[in-house]
């Protein structure tokens, strides 16, 4: 089983009217506005997006190592997408 740990730094939250405002930096930054449920969903999508990038990079590196060691002669990683809907 693989374990991916994602560290979200510089997280700031505040209340703006009935909505929450959250600023998150994950190799970049995103400004999010919305209620708790909406923000939770958007944060989850950011984490999934970052996880997908880590997995793709790791898979590319693993294929290159196997090629260099002569274990395999070719290989590739196809891109996968996370479909999301924001209300």
Curated annotation (Swiss-Prot):
It comes from the Viruses. Keywords: Early protein, Host cytoplasm. It is found in: Host cytoplasm. Its main location: host cell. One of its GO terms (cellular component) is host cell cytoplasm. Induction: Expressed in the early phase of the viral replicative cycle. Expression of early genes is repressed by viral Repc (latency) and favored by viral Ner protein. This is Uncharacterized protein gp7.
């Amino acid at each position: 089983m693989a374990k991916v740990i994602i560290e979200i730094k510089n997280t700031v939250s505040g209340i703006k009217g009935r909505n929450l405002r959250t600023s998150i930096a994950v190799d970049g930054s995103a400004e999010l506005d919305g209620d708790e449920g909406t923000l939770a969903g958007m944060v989850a999508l950011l984490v999934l997006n970052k996880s997908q990038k880590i997995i793709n990079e790791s898979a590319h590196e693993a294929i290159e190592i196997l090629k260099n060691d002569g274990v395999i002669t070719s290989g590739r990683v196809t891109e996968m997408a996370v479909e999301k809907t924001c209300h």
